[in-house]
Amino acid sequence: MIKWPWKVQESAHQTALPWQEALSIPLLTCLTEQEQSKLVTLAERFLQQKRLVPLQGFELDSLRSCRIALLFCLPVLELGLEWLDGFHEVLIYPAPFVVDDEWEDDIGLVHNQRIVQSGQSWQQGPIVLNWLDIQDSFDASGFNLIIHEVAHKLDTRNGDRASGVPFIPLREVAGWEHDLHAAMNNIQEEIELVGDNAASIDAYAASDPAECFAVLSEYFFSAPELFAPRFPSLWQRFCQFYQQDPLQRLHRTNDTDSFSATNVH
C-alpha cells in the first residue's frame, strides 16, 4: 500500500494541499502510484524553494499552485530537484503577455518591437508563464508550456547559453547533435510540404536547436506516440537523459484500460 505524502495527520488536515485532485489531469494519469508519490514529494519541495508570483490580477490558489509544481517536477522526476536550481521565482500572467524585443538584422541595425509571448526562461533569472497556456498544458496533446521552459533551464546547465544539448557525457554530444539536427531537417521538410500550421510537430522545433530540444521535450512527455516512431534514435537519447520512458507508460495504461474493458460484465 502506498503512503501518500500529502495524507497528513488529522490535526493538520486543514492545511493539507490538494495533491490528489492536482494529479487528476490527463498528462499525469499514466504515472504509477509510486511515480505519482515521488512526483508529489518533489513538488512539495519545489513549492518550498520557489516563489510563485501572480501578476496583473491573476489569482493563484492552492490547486493551481500544486498543478504548476507537478508540471515543473515531471521532467526532473528521475534527475532530481537540484536540476531546477537555476531560478527562484515563477512569474505568472493571466494570459499571453507583451514584451519589448530587441534584435539585430544582417547589416547590424538594431530594431525594437513589441511582441506577444507565452513564456520566457531567463538564463540567470525567473521563468515567466501565463495561465491560459498552463491550462492547455494539462492534456496529453504535444503542447506543454511549463515543460518547454523547464527544458530551456536544463539546456543552459551545459553552458552559458541554450544549445539544444543538455548536460550529458561528452562522448554522447556528437551523436545527440547529429540526431537533433536530423530531426530539425525532417520537420523543416514537412513544413515546406504542408505549411507551418499543418505540420504534425510544432514548426517552432525547426527554428533553432535549443527550441527543437524544448519542443521535443513537450512531445516526449505529452505525445510520445508522435515522437518515438518518427525519431527513434533521438527518442532513445531523450529516454536516457530524462531517465524516463513516457511511451512505455502510455502502453501500460492502454493495456490496463483494454484489460478492464474486456472484463466488464
UniProtKB/Swiss-Prot annotation:
Cofactor note: Binds 1 zinc ion per subunit.
Segments forming a coiled coil: none
N-terminal signal peptide: none
One matching Pfam family: Peptidase_M90
InterPro entries linked: MetalloPept_cat_dom_sf, MtfA_enterob, MtfA_fam, MtfA_N
Keywords noted in UniProt: Aminopeptidase, Cytoplasm, Hydrolase, Metal-binding, Metalloprotease, Protease, Zinc
Listed cofactors: Zn(2+)
GO cellular component: cytosol
Superkingdom of source: Bacteria
Main location: cytoplasm
Subcellular location: Cytoplasm
GO molecular function, a single term: metallopeptidase activity
The EC number(s) this enzyme carries: 3.4.11.-
One GO biological process term: proteolysis
Residues binding Zn(2+): 111, 148, 152, 211
General function of this protein: Involved in the modulation of the activity of the glucose-phosphotransferase system (glucose-PTS). Interacts with the transcriptional repressor Mlc, preventing its interaction with DNA and leading to the modulation of expression of genes regulated by Mlc, including ptsG, which encodes the PTS system glucose-specific EIICB component.
Family that this chain belongs to: Belongs to the MtfA family.
Quaternary structure annotation from Swiss-Prot or TrEMBL: Interacts with Mlc.
Protein name according to UniProt: Mlc titration factor A
Organism of provenance: Escherichia coli (strain SMS-3-5 / SECEC)
